Amino acid sequence: MSQEDIFSKVKDIVAEQLSVDVAEVKPESSFQNDLGADSLDTVELVMALEEAFDIEIPDEAAEGIATVQDAVDFIASKAA
């Protein structure tokens, strides 16, 4: 799966989970600062990403995922 494919899927999931417009979801978007996620939203988002990509995101890794690109990079590293 290419970075573009991963980003597209992550973007859709983020938009749905955080109830934001897909156009607002950019690689550099911070889940909390730009997209208004609180800590519960972030946990739910991680769970949705785990399910969608059939991966496990450990708590330590989840804490380091602050932006959309962070999520894409982590997923790409697991898919490699």
UniProtKB/Swiss-Prot annotation:
The keyword Transferase appears for this protein: no
Keywords, ordered alphabetically: Cytoplasm, Fatty acid biosynthesis, Fatty acid metabolism, Lipid biosynthesis, Lipid metabolism, Phosphopantetheine, Phosphoprotein
Any Gene Ontology biological process: lipid A biosynthetic process
Pfam families named among the record's database cross-references: PP-binding
Localization, UniProt: Cytoplasm
GO molecular function terms attached to this record: acyl binding; acyl carrier activity; phosphopantetheine binding
Recorded family membership: Belongs to the acyl carrier protein (ACP) family.
Role according to the record: Carrier of the growing fatty acid chain in fatty acid biosynthesis.
Protein name: Acyl carrier protein
